[in-house]
Amino acid sequence: MASQLTDAFARKFYYLRLSVTDVCNFRCTYCLPDGYKPAGVTNKGFLSLDEIRRVTRAFANLGTEKVRLTGGEPSLRRDFCDIIAAVRENPSIRQIAVTTNGYRLARDVAQWREAGLTAVNVSVDSLDARQFHAITGQDKFRQVMAGIDAAFDAGFEKVKVNTVLMRDVNHHQLDTFLNWIQSRPIQLRFIELMETGEGSDLFRKHHISGATIRDELLKRGWIHQLRSRADGPAQVFCHPDYQGEIGLIMPYEKDFCASCNRLRVSSVGKLHLCLFGDGGVDLRDLLAEEGQQAALMARIETALLGKKQTHFLHQGNTGITQNLSYIGG
């Protein structure tokens, strides 16, 4: 095995976020308010199953322990179960997760688990069915809730729920969310709204710091937990009276990037060193044949030397990220 992926700032990278499509059937206000429009797809289309197999093998050989399958909506891929199984072929990858809008969970989550999936994140921005419809453009609230129940029934001990925190939309609904997770092993993660190229007006209107939630949690006796090395950037809080947990993801917080441990590969095979970085390094020409593994690994290692110490969101620089479906958030 090659040496562990490490950048110029001694950060080690154990975590790959792999987008398998940028197509999504929801129209979330903060991501694709006008619905999906094909943009970044080349004539080759999205990564094939064999290309996914090769890129994940290269990352596994470079020390990756966790792969998250993202989109768009990854479950729109008809071969999604095969994708999970292909990633599972790497014994050093201990965690295989998916981030999903949840609309296919009730139908398919048991099959995903059987294929090798170890963790599920579901996007739910409101626990009010009408507001959920207004945010997502889809009247699927009950279907998504049934999907979360199905994930528990399939044997997942914990489900993570991602909630984009928005001023005057859901920031004042903390009590509703806390009641929901009191008797459920759900880690509810409030994610600060991030500015994207297409979403700057929305950002100015609805951004609110996660610190408002953190202050309220601490006031109510919630306890800040320590992070493990393959964890994401969430600050996680627990409470003895609650089965669930609260996570806060605050990209505008000081030193947010100091604990960065993930790299991203887009659905067309570009390596992105940062969600809000410029450009991307094309890996696709090295995904055609089995004999290209050494060259592929070398390109990944070389590219990592160019990773910057921090994003530049504070200066309003969102890089190439026009919307979050492009790289997979």
Curated annotation (Swiss-Prot):
The keyword Zinc-finger does not apply. [4Fe-4S] cluster 2 binds at residues 257, 260, 274. It holds the Pfam family Radical_SAM. It catalyses: GTP + AH2 + S-adenosyl-L-methionine = (8S)-3',8-cyclo-7,8-dihydroguanosine 5'-triphosphate + 5'-deoxyadenosine + L-methionine + A + H(+). [4Fe-4S] cluster 1 binds at residues 24, 28, 31. Its cofactor is [4Fe-4S] cluster. Signal peptide: none annotated. Binds 2 [4Fe-4S] clusters. Binds 1 [4Fe-4S] cluster coordinated with 3 cysteines and an exchangeable S-adenosyl-L-methionine and 1 [4Fe-4S] cluster coordinated with 3 cysteines and the GTP-derived substrate. It is an enzyme of class 4 (lyase). Coiled coil: none annotated. PROSITE patterns: MOAA_NIFB_PQQE, RADICAL_SAM. S-adenosyl-L-methionine binds at residues 30, 72, 123, 194. Residues 8-234 form the Radical SAM core domain. GO terms for molecular function: 4 iron, 4 sulfur cluster binding; cyclic pyranopterin monophosphate synthase activity; GTP 3',8'-cyclase activity; GTP binding; metal ion binding; S-adenosyl-L-methionine binding. Pathway: Cofactor biosynthesis; molybdopterin biosynthesis. GO terms for biological process: Mo-molybdopterin cofactor biosynthetic process. GTP binds at residues 17, 68, 99, 160, 262-264. InterPro entries: Aldolase_TIM, Elp3/MiaA/NifB-like_rSAM, MoaA, MoaA_NifB_PqqE_Fe-S-bd_CS, MoaA_twitch, MoCo_biosynth_MoaA/MoaC, rSAM. Belongs to the radical SAM superfamily. MoaA family. Monomer and homodimer. NCBIfam families: moaA. HAMAP family: MoaA_B. Catalyzes the cyclization of GTP to (8S)-3',8-cyclo-7,8-dihydroguanosine 5'-triphosphate. This is GTP 3',8-cyclase. It comes from Cronobacter sakazakii (strain ATCC BAA-894) (Enterobacter sakazakii).
